[in-house]
């Protein structure tokens, strides 16, 4: 009996790539989805300079590199760079030979057909994978929460989607996309701090800003009330030190910044907040399934990690929905990685093994096979 080969699961987000082995409960590798190329050839004499760097190494050398994010708003826009990220994932992060393992990739909701074909082609032709599957990110998050019906509000670094799912199938006509996510919030905070006279030039400083965001921000249950409270006392204020010794004091920004998720006008965007977008998505679905969706609103992605977000979502959705509706918000503690976890669960199910698209099927039918096998 030959040893069962573990499938590889790769969740390519706009901000971070999560990769690991099916059956594991967390990704082995999590690194920034960036590719950097030297701005000037031969600056670093004798460094054995590479023509490109990926992930953390690109981040740490960003001073001499031009950085690109090959995934914008969840969709791959630069295939050469994307290939570099996958290469880095297999050979440097996971240290595996891709031709020996089935590969499960994730895709954004409403990913264009040509993109799915291109992914399929690269996996089979460039990396010689024996088998391949591509799954919609939000559907995997729903599986990770132990459900097959519900609506997923998935908010990452580059994009936010609301995806209603019925019996394991995403309902494309009701999926909504909001181009407001983690990176916009980080950039806004940096802008605020620059206006207050702090400087953010180095990567280390940008990382600190992300740290402030992740450790100090929270969502207010009642925004107006919170502003009043913050104005009357300094209890909410927190201080943190930058690498160069400057001390930043953060007060009502702690909840004012993430408030933009519910009031995008704060960032100058004419868009519905995440609560309204979720409501609009549900409203586009058949009457018969709305009750099931309201009762299973699953939060997913790093930008849903703020304390207080689930309670606020509960309050806002309840006030939008019909009075007889029971609204339940599900916010699993590991939701930062729930897309990856769902992929790990799916790819290790015995019932899933005959659903892989094999190299042989690809050779017979070409990239279009992906639409018949993965839906």
UniProtKB/Swiss-Prot annotation:
Where does this protein reside within or beyond the cell? Cytoplasm, Cytoskeleton
Record's keyword terms, sorted? ATP-binding, Cytoplasm, Cytoskeleton, Hydrolase, Nucleotide-binding
EC number(s) on file: 3.6.4.-
Cystine residue pairs:
none
Got a GO cellular component term for this one? cytoskeleton
What catalytic activity is recorded? ATP + H2O = ADP + phosphate + H(+)
Name the Pfam families on file. Actin
User: What superkingdom does the record give?
Assistant: Eukaryota
Q: What class of enzyme is it?
A: hydrolase
User: Which InterPro entries does the protein's record reference?
Assistant: Actin (IPR004000), Actin/actin-like_CS (IPR020902), Actin_CS (IPR004001), ATPase_NBD (IPR043129)
A Gene Ontology molecular function term for this protein is:
hydrolase activity
The record's CDD domains line, in alphabetical order, gives: ASKHA_NBD_actin
Q: What does this protein do?
A: Actins are highly conserved proteins that are involved in various types of cell motility and are ubiquitously expressed in all eukaryotic cells.
What is the similarity comment for this entry? Belongs to the actin family.
Q: Which named protein is this?
A: Actin-1
Gene source species: Suillus bovinus (Jersey cow bolete)
């Amino acid at each position: 009996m030959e040893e069962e080969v573990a499938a590889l699961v790769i969740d390519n987000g706009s901000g971070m790539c999560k990769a690991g082995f099916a059956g594991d409960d967390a990704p082995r590798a999590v690194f920034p989805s960036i590719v950097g190329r030297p701005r000037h050839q031969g600056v670093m004499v004798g460094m054995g300079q590479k023509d490109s760097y990926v992930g953390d190494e690109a981040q740490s050398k960003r001073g001499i590199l031009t950085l690109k994010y090959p995934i914008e708003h969840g969709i791959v826009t630069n295939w050469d760079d994307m290939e570099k990220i996958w290469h880095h994932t297999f050979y440097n992060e996971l240290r595996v030979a891709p031709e020996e393992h089935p590969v499960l990739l994730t895709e954004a909701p409403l990913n264009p057909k040509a993109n799915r074909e291109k992914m399929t082609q690269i996996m089979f032709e460039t990396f010689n994978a024996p088998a391949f599957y591509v799954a919609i990110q939000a559907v995997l998050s729903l599986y990770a929460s132990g459900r097959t019906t519900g609506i997923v509000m998935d908010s990452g670094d580059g994009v936010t989607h609301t995806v209603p799912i019925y019996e394991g199938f995403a309902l494309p006509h009701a999926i909504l996309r909001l181009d407001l996510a983690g990176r916009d919030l980080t950039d806004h905070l940096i802008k605020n701090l620059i206006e207050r006279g702090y400087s953010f030039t180095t990567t280390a400083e940008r990382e600190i800003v992300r740290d402030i965001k992740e450790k100090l921000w929270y969502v207010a249950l009642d925004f107006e009330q919170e502003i009043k409270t913050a104005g009357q006392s300094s209890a909410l204020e927190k201080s943190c030190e930058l690498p160069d010794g400057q001390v930043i004091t953060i007060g009502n920004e702690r909840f004012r910044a993430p408030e933009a998720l519910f009031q995008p006008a704060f960032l100058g965007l004419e868009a519905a907040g995440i609560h309204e977008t979720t409501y609009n998505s549900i409203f586009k679905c058949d009457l018969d399934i709305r009750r099931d969706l309201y009762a299973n609103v699953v939060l997913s992605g790093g930008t849903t990690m703020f304390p207080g977000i689930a309670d606020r979502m509960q309050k806002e959705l309840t006030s939008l929905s019909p009075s007889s509706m029971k609204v339940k918000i599900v916010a699993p503690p590991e939701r930062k990685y729930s897309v990856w976890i769902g992929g790990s669960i799916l790819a290790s199910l015995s019932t899933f093994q005959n659903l892989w698209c094999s190299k042989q099927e690809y050779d017979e039918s070409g990239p279009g096979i992906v639409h018949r096998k993965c839906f």
